[in-house]
Curated annotation (Swiss-Prot):
It is found in: Cytoplasm. Its main location: cytoplasm. Pfam families: Arg_repressor, Arg_repressor_C. Pathway: Amino-acid degradation; L-arginine degradation via ADI pathway. InterPro entries: Arg_repress, Arg_repress_C, Arg_repress_C_sf, Arg_repress_DNA-bd, WH-like_DNA-bd_sf, WH_DNA-bd_sf. This is Arginine regulator. One of its GO terms (molecular function) is DNA-binding transcription factor activity. Belongs to the ArgR family. Gene3D superfamilies: 3.30.1360.40, Winged helix-like DNA-binding domain superfamily/Winged helix DNA-binding domain. Keywords: Arginine metabolism, Cytoplasm, DNA-binding, Transcription, Transcription regulation. Regulates the transcription of the arc operon, involved in arginine catabolism. It comes from Clostridium perfringens (strain 13 / Type A). SUPFAM superfamilies: C-terminal domain of arginine repressor, Winged helix' DNA-binding domain.
Length: 151
């Protein structure tokens, strides 16, 4: 597959998502096929991830795919987090993040700038960050989110 084919496929996917209510990947595969593009579910899933297209739940319990606008700050945070974090653990209201030497302050600042209301604050040293969460449930959710950035 050439980059041109991939770019064309991405363009068609974007047009379909923006013009139609697509609730399932199977529906999108059918729409692509009608446009002359054959794609496997695995390839489509990768494309959706690369294009920041997510399946969102709405108040009426409807799910559909939408394009998210992930800004440069978030991308930069994810890259730095992934390359700098050695380990992460949690206990009740706290998440402990162990980083490469000198990276804790930067990552702590990134976490603070996310503006997540579930986080009360961070304390950073040379290679360690303590994330203080507002509830045990928030700790578990944030831990999963931060831990998934390491993959």
């Amino acid at each position: 597959m050439s980059n041109l084919e991939k770019s064309l496929r991405h363009e068609v996917i974007l047009d379909i998502i923006e013009s139609k209510c697509i609730c399932k990947q199977e529906e999108l595969i059918i729409e692509l096929k009608e446009c002359g593009i054959n794609v496997t579910q695995a390839t489509l899933s990768r494309d959706l991830h690369e294009m920041n297209i997510i399946r969102k739940s709405f108040e009426n319990h409807e799910h559909r795919y939408i394009v998210t606008k992930e800004d440069k700050f978030i991308k930069k945070f994810k890259n730095i987090f992934k390359s700098s974090v050695r380990s992460i653990s949690m206990q009740e209201y706290f998440i402990s993040v162990n980083t490469l030497d000198g990276m804790a302050s930067l990552i702590g600042e990134f976490i603070d700038r996310l503006g997540d209301g579930r986080i009360a604050g961070t304390v950073a040293k040379k290679n360690h960050i303590l994330v203080l969460c507002r509830s045990v449930n928030a700790t578990q959710q944030i831990f999963k989110e931060l831990d998934s950035l390491r993959v």
